[in-house]
Amino acid sequence: MTMTKDGTLTGTIDGTFTAEKMYGAVWNDYAEYRTQKEIIEPGYCVASTDDGQVYKTTEKFQACDGIVSDTFGFAIGETDECKTPLAVAGRVLAYCSGNREDYHAGDTVCAGPEGKVCKMTREEIREWPDRIVGIVSEIPEYETWGTDEVLVNGRIWIKVK
């Protein structure tokens, strides 16, 4: 490890790292790697087969394992077979069904056709509470996000449940 004059640490750690506090994280979610039935780009809702492979959701209210993430700051479970990171906590960029302008911060969403999130009505929330994927937290106006300049590509921010 090397520390610069401004206190920045750089380097690689082999073994255990312990810190009392950490600040300044620039990524938004915690992800779990899963095996995939097909290549799925970030931003899509996925369901899983009985053997645990994920695939894009195909219908509204389909049980959803998560949203494929390219904004995670921490991930677990990557192996030679598990290459698809699913957001399990925090915020993730997701593609939405229909007109993006119809979505607003605070809207509840579920999985939908083509792996896109769908806005839920109050009645649907009462009928299908187990199908809630998350809550819209922001409709970005910017084209890239973060230090790696992740393409937003028309996606919206979802706080995953």
Task: Kindly give the residue locations of the regions a language model identified.
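Extracellular receptor-binding modules and their adjoining Ser/Thr/Gly/Asp/Asn-rich linkers
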Residues: T2-K161
